[in-house]
Every structure is written in structure tokens, then in C-alpha cells.
């Protein structure tokens, strides 16, 4: 008995250690946003865990011990600075090094005011904007960490009627009217098996492990984000870890992945991801007649030359292949195999962003290049033994090179932002398609190419009163290119915008925005030629939409918010297919190529009312009508949609 007690006494501490809760430390640094100098003796707390925090040392660094695993944001406060909340971070064995930027506030020199800010708003976009944090990305039901599937539950967002695709229809618009940015670099499409001339696809290229947060705009677009009529998804990626090397291997529902974060020396950090799908194995085991396969990769490096200069390099690549499973038998399989082509797509984006902090000024120089190669191939009875069986061979490419400069200046209550950009777009299409009927199986040959130089400029100013009750923003943008004479004239694409927000009380805020936005029609429409090699759509103009939004927010103790927002949109200069009289806004939510037909302008109008609680509960109602200019008749294109 005595020996048993000794053994138990020895085992007990070991078991207690084994069942003790696992905790981690959170390390980071607090710096001044303008001077880039460390902020000493600032208080940093973990939001949601009372009393859990630390103070920065003389170098601005902090370390918070014994934090339970989970998703948290941090809050920093210091005398003379505005209290700031960070994006959400995952606390785990690979918790990243967190850098917090604080902004001076002369009104707070004699006191420290801690005001949590879970509902961040932009002065430029006080309505029609939502920030997607890690909590939503990781826990959104049914989304599988796919951003396009997360936002489909938001008010004003409808999903493709083809339910397995990520085509976003925002406030009655088209899938081609959405724009994507990643750390300030434009990404033409974020999905595998993309529809050329639109956006969307069944699976996202972006690995959620690398995302810090996403800003989703459904209106009130910032002046430095061009070419959007319906929405902008603005990704912010994490930075690499300057302290240690961390790697993660994952087996998902459709792919295996490897990601990592670390540092290369003392000045450079890196982040990467590589994924390989095994969908083709699953589809073959299920007896499906098509076998999709994709590979994607992503990387980001950041080099800090000194306190005032940094260079970010970013890359995103996707490779897609869809083969046919000709071994599959049965009536349904044979029907699909009779018309489905094999698909090969390669897409990539490479970009570099140099940022210089110069006191009140921040200058950014961004250079990027994106590329898409889309190929479809089909033989009669899937017999490729002879070229006589060829029914379709399509190869189409799109590429765009962009150089953009931005400068931001802070002058007390004012923030000014101005910039300019140059771009060069190249589009080619080489197709062979067998025509039947009156053409008696003739092999049609279609070739076209397009080379466009474009330019743009923008300016915006934000103002906030000393008591933070009133915020105003005004901006303009102008774009042009060499496609035709009207598009060369910048003032034809003059895009003004105005927004305002007023705090009626501590709980109520009234906000609104109005603006005119322009977007270039898809290259597939601009480059369409007839049999004589003449461009048929030379009379096209930039597509245009006028949008106004008005919203009201009600806050309860800064932890609960209910908002209601109404919007009105009026489209004009919208291309219309003369083949089926369907506007471009109603197309682009399927595989293949859209837009390569003859077009003419039309007008579309939509009105709506949306209610948007901060919790994942929402309702939307909108109605859209299409006005055919020749007859004046109104044809419904989208009905009323209700979503809970």
C-alpha cells in the first residue's frame, strides 16, 4: 500500500501537467504610423480576455504570455495616441509576429481613452463596406474557407444559379463587374477554371492560411480602386514571421497543401503556399465523366531596408486541367462526353510594391503583371486520332501590365490621396470550330488580337471633425485608353464620388454615399472581329453606373450593431448581345468565354433595401429592371430576392 501511494504521488504531477491547458505567447511591436519609430510603454490587451495584456518596452516590443489558443484581436492604447484595434489573428504554435501602427492625437495628450472598435468604418466608404476577419473565414458554415462563398450570405449578394461556382452577383450586377486586389496589387480572377470575360469559378486560388483580413465593398468604392461596378474584394495578406520558421501541411476536402512563414536574414520575411488537388481521383471513383485537377501557389516577401522604406513582392499562380473520363458508360455519361471539351488554363500574377514613409507623406509605387492562357479542345466522339474529327480548338490569352503611383498626406483633420497609373493590355484569340447545318461541317477559323494602352488619375480627400462626429470624403477618378476616340478622352470617364457620416448619438450613426463609376468592357467584346477582320464593337464606351446608398447603424455598448442600408443603381452604356438580346450583366456565370459577340449599349436600373446585422443573419430585397432603348419596353431580368 505504501509503495502504491508513492507511485500515485509520482504519477499525479505528471498527469496534471498532461491535462493542463495549452497556452501560447503573443509577440509584437508598436510603432508610430508617421515617424515609424517605436512607441514605448503602450498598453496592449487581448480583446475578449479581461486583464490579459502587456506593456511595450523602450524598443516598442511586447510579449503577452499564457494566451489560450483561438482567434483574437489586440487593442493598443497610449497617452497622445488614438486607441487602435488590430485585425484578428490565430493564436497557436505558429502565431505570427504582430506589428501595430498607432496614430498621434493631440486631443488625447492628457488622458488615455480606451474605446474598443470592433466595427471599423472607412471615411471614404462609410456604407456598403464590410471587413471580413479570420473569425468569419474560419467558422463561416458551408464556406470551406472560400471567400467567395463567405460573402454570398451578405446582403445584396446573390450566388450563381449554378450552385457549385463562385460567381458573385452583387446588387443585381454581373460577375464581370467585380474587382480583386491583394496588398494593393490587382488580381484579375481569384478562382480556378475561370470564365474568360467575367469572373468566378468553382474553387478559390487563394489559400486562406495566408489571409489577414479582407475588405468587401459593394459600393462607395475608393478612388484608387478602378474598374468596379458591383464590388471590390481587397485582400490583406499576413507578413512572414521574423522570429522563427513555421510550416504547416494540410489535407483538405479536395486538396493537399503546404504553407510556411519565416524570415530570410534580419530584414526579409516570407510567406508561401502550394496546393495540389485530388479531385480527379475522387471524381473517377464516383464514376463521373469529367476529371478536374488544379495546382496553385502563392508567395509574399517583405524587405525592410530601413525604418522608412520597404519592398513587397507578391505572386499568385493557378494551373487547371479538366480531362474526360471516356471509360465511363451510361446514357448520362455519354451525353456529357458528347459536348464537354477538355480544358487547360494557366493564370498568374506577379507584383512589386515599394513603399516610402516620409513623415506625413506615404508614397507607394506598384508594378504588376497578370496573365491568363485559356485553351479548350474537342474532337467528335472524343477521337483525336485524326484532325478531321476536330470540332473545337480554342486558345485565348489575356495579359495586363500596370504601373501605379500613390501618395497619401495627413494634415491634421485632413487626409489627401492622389495618384496616377499606366497600363498595357494584350488580348489574343485563335479558334477553330466546326460549323454544321447550312455550313455542312465547315471548319471556321477565327483569329483576333488587341493591344491597348491605358491611363488613369485619381484624387480624394477625407475630413474628420475634432469631436469625431462628422466625417466627409470627396474624390474623383478619370480613365482612358487607346481603343477608340471617345475612350481617349479622360473627361468622358469622369468619376466623382462623395460620402458622409454623422454620429447622431453614442448609439446612432447616419451615413451615405453617391458616385459615378466606370468600367472597361471585357477584352472578348473589345477584340471581336468579323470575317473581314474588322473590329465590330469599335463604338463601345466605358460601362457606367450611378449608385447612391443611405444607411443607419445602431450600436449597443460597442459590441452589437444593427444596420439598415438602401441603395439605388442606374446602369448605362451597357453592351447588349444582338444574337439573343440579353445584356452583358446577365451573362458570365458559366464555364467558357463570354463577351465575344456584337454588342450595343443599353440602360439598366435597380433599387433595393437591405438590412445588415453584424452577426451572420441578414435579409435582402432588391428588384432590377432592364430598359430596352429601342422600344422603351421594360423587361425584367432579375426578380425579388430574399435571403436569411
Q: Model regions: which residues?
A:
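Surface-exposed extracellular loop regions of Gram-negative outer-membrane beta-barrel proteins
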Residues: 191, 327-332, 428-435, 506-548, ...
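Face-selective signature of the C-terminal outer-membrane beta-barrel domain
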Residues: 302-320, 341-487, 503, 563
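Short, acidic, small-residue-rich periplasmic hinge/interaction motif at the N-terminus
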Residues: 31, 35, 42-47, 77-82, ...
Amino acid at each position: 500500500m505504501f509503495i502504491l501511494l508513492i507511485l500515485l504521488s509520482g504519477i499525479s504531477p505528471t498527469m496534471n501537467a498532461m491535462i493542463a491547458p495549452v497556452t501560447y505567447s503573443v509577440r509584437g511591436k508598436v510603432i508610430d504610423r508617421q515617424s515609424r519609430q517605436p512607441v514605448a510603454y503602450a498598453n496592449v490587451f487581448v480583446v475578449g480576455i479581461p486583464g490579459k495584456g502587456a506593456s511595450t518596452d523602450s524598443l516598442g516590443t511586447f510579449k503577452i504570455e499564457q494566451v489560450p489558443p483561438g482567434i483574437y484581436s489586440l487593442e493598443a492604447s497610449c497617452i497622445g495616441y488614438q486607441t487602435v484595434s488590430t485585425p484578428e489573428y490565430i493564436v497557436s504554435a505558429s502565431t505570427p509576429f504582430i506589428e501595430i501602427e498607432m496614430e498621434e492625437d493631440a486631443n488625447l495628450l492628457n488622458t488615455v481613452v480606451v474605446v474598443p472598435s470592433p466595427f471599423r468604418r472607412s471615411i471614404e466608404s462609410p456604407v456598403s463596406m464590410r471587413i471580413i476577419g479570420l473569425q468569419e473565414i474560419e467558422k463561416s458554415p458551408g464556406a470551406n474557407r472560400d471567400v467567395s462563398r463567405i460573402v454570398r450570405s451578405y446582403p445584396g449578394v446573390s450566388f450563381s444559379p449554378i450552385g457549385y461556382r463562385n460567381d458573385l452577383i452583387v446588387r443585381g450586377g454581373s460577375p464581370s463587374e467585380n474587382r480583386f486586389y491583394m496588398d494593393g496589387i490587382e488580381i484579375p480572377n481569384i478562382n480556378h477554371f475561370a470564365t474568360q470575360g467575367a469572373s468566378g469559378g468553382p474553387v478559390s486560388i487563394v489559400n486562406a492560411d495566408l489571409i489577414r483580413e479582407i475588405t468587401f465593398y459593394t459600393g462607395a468604392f475608393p478612388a484608387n480602386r478602378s474598374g468596379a461596378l458591383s464590388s471590390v474584394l481587397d485582400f490583406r495578406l499576413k507578413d512572414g514571421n521574423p522570429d522563427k520558421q513555421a510550416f504547416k501541411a494540410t489535407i483538405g476536402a479536395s486538396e493537399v497543401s503546404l504553407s510556411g512563414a519565416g524570415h530570410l536574414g534580419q530584414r526579409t520575411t516570407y510567406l508561401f503556399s502550394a496546393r495540389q488537388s485530388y479531385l480527379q481521383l475522387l471524381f473517377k471513383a464516383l464514376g463521373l465523366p469529367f476529371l478536374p485537377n488544379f495546382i496553385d501557389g502563392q508567395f509574399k516577401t517583405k524587405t525592410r531596408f530601413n525604418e522608412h522604406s520597404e519592398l513587397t513582392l507578391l505572386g499568385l499562380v493557378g494551373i487547371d486541367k479538366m480531362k474526360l473520363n471516356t471509360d465511363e458508360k451510361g446514357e448520362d455519361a455519354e451525353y456529357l462526353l458528347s459536348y464537354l471539351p477538355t480544358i487547360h488554363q494557366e493564370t498568374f500574377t506577379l507584383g512589386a510594391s515599394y513603399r516610402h514613409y516620409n513623415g506625413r507623406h506615404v508614397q507607394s509605387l506598384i508594378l504588376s503583371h497578370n496573365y491568363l492562357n485559356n485553351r479548350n479542345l474537342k474532337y467528335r466522339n472524343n477521337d483525336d486520332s485524326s484532325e478531321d474529327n476536330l470540332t473545337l480548338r480554342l486558345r485565348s490569352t489575356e495579359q495586363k501590365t500596370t504601373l501605379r503611383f500613390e501618395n497619401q498626406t495627413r494634415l491634421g483633420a485632413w487626409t489627401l490621396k492622389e495618384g496616377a497609373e499606366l497600363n498595357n493590355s494584350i488580348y489574343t484569340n485563335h479558334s477553330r470550330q466546326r460549323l454544321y447545318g447550312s455550313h455542312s461541317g465547315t471548319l471556321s477559323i477565327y483569329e483576333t488580337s488587341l493591344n491597348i494602352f491605358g491611363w488613369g488619375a485619381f484624387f480624394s480627400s477625407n475630413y474628420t471633425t475634432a469631436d469625431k462626429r462628422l466625417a466627409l470624403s470627396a474624390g474623383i477618378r478619370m480613365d482612358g485608353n487607346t481603343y477608340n476616340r471617345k475612350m481617349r478622352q479622360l473627361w468622358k470617364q469622369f468619376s466623382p464620388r462623395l460620402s458622409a457620416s454623422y454620429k447622431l448619438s453614442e448609439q446612432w450613426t447616419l451615413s451615405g454615399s453617391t458616385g459615378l463609376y466606370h468600367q472597361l468592357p471585357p477584352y472578348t467584346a473589345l477584340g471581336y472581329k468579323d470575317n473581314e477582320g474588322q473590329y465590330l464593337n469599335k463604338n463601345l464606351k466605358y460601362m457606367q453606373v450611378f449608385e447612391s446608398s443611405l444607411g443607419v447603424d445602431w450600436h449597443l455598448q460597442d459590441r452589437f450593431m444593427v444596420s439598415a442600408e438602401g441603395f439605388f443603381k442606374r446602369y448605362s452604356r451597357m453592351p447588349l448581345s444582338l444574337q439573343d438580346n440579353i445584356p452583358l450583366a446577365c451573362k458570365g456565370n458559366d464555364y467558357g468565354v463570354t463577351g465575344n459577340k456584337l454588342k450595343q449599349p443599353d440602360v439598366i436600373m435597380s433599387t433595393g433595401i437591405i438590412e445588415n446585422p453584424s452577426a451572420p443573419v441578414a435579409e435582402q430585397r432588391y428588384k432590377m429592371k432592364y430598359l430596352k432603348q429601342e422600344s422603351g419596353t421594360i423587361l425584367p431580368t432579375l426578380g425579388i430576392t430574399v435571403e436569411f
